């Protein structure tokens, strides 16, 4: 059988109920959950004009549960081996209540609950009031509290009795003004910030990349950087970061070119001075009529503008043989 959790409501004071003539109270142990038992107070009351009585279970002084006996779906009483009575109440809505009456008046409480005759009930949980000794009648205010009233919280579809909420919510708290003119909430915040201490986090952050992957990436970066850099030339010396680059390299190149050109010109002039010689003067001989060259010329040379070419001696002999001497 499925059961519904009990609904706790506000109840009248215990003294007001126990002051009625047909009433009685007893200590009970109420079952909460599967195996938990909690000690509470139970009161049986029957008001004149009602078909049956009611049982009130007080979990707190003014809060508890209320069950009309004529609206119960079932009621069972079990006598255990120890002599205790176990009472099970189930309402039509599925609310379930299980309790054990304890104390000297437990038997009277169970018989009144089963029979519906509340004349033999006693008050065990408190001292008798003076109204009970005088057998006072029920006051009209208590009777009006015990009578069933219609539920005003049921939605009927109309907006009668609707009250608009206030502009400012009830949860908003008013700020307390400090006599010095400051805001108390700001001072509380400052004090709370001072008391706060930073604690190191317990979570350990794992490295995003493994060591092998980092090594591979370092190698690839090194290769790409070496490919991007231009290869150093032989003519241009590698310049360090400390050497300033203010056009000095170009000046050095120009000076080198000028030095090589001047050295080449000087070498050519020296060669021309050695090779080029003035042409020898030939004096005509009286005997041969000026046809034969002088004795001083052993060699015949052919001069050009820049270089003097020597003629070999064989050619000279052939030329001399072809000359005809006239006697």
From Swiss-Prot:
Biased composition (Polar residues): 130-144
Region (Disordered): 129-306
InterPro entries attached to this UniProt entry: PH_15 (IPR040443)
UniProt cross-references to Pfam families, sorted A to Z: PH_15
Positions with biased composition (Basic and acidic residues): 184-196, 233-276
Protein name: Uncharacterized protein C15H7.4
Species assigned in the record: Caenorhabditis elegans
Lineage: Eukaryota, Metazoa, Ecdysozoa, Nematoda, Chromadorea
């Amino acid at each position: 059988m499925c059961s519904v959790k009990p609904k706790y409501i506000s109840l009248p004071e215990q003294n007001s109920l126990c002051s009625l003539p047909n009433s009685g109270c007893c200590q009970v142990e109420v079952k909460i959950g599967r195996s938990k038992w909690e000690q509470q107070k139970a009161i049986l009351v029957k008001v004149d004009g009602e078909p049956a009585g009611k049982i009130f279970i007080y979990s707190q002084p003014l809060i508890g549960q209320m069950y009309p006996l004529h609206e119960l779906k079932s009621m069972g009483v079990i006598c255990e081996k120890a002599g205790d009575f176990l009472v099970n109440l189930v309402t039509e809505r599925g609310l379930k209540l299980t309790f054990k009456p304890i104390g000297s008046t437990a038997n009277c409480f169970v018989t009144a609950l089963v029979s519906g005759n509340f004349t033999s009930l006693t008050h065990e949980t408190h001292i008798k009031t003076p109204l009970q000794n005088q057998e006072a009648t029920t006051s009209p205010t208590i009777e009006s509290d015990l009578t069933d009233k219609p539920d005003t919280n049921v939605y009927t579809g109309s907006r009668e009795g609707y009250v608009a909420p206030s502009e400012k919510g009830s949860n908003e708290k008013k700020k307390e003004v400090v006599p010095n003119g400051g805001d108390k909430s700001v001072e509380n915040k400052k004090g709370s910030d001072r008391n706060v201490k930073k604690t190191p986090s317990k979570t350990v952050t794992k490295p995003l990349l493994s060591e092998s992957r980092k090594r591979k990436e370092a190698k690839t970066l090194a290769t790409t950087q070496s490919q991007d850099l231009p290869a150093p030339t032989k003519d241009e010396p590698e310049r360090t970061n400390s050497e300033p680059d203010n056009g000095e390299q170009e000046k050095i190149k120009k000076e080198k070119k000028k030095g090589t050109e001047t050295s080449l010109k000087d070498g050519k002039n020296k060669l021309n001075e050695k090779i080029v010689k003035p042409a020898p003067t030939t004096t005509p001989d009286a005997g041969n009529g000026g046809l034969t060259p002088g004795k001083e010329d052993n060699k015949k040379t052919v001069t050009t503008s820049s270089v003097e070419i020597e003629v070999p001696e064989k050619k000279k002999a052939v030329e001399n043989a072809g000359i005809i001497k006239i006697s």
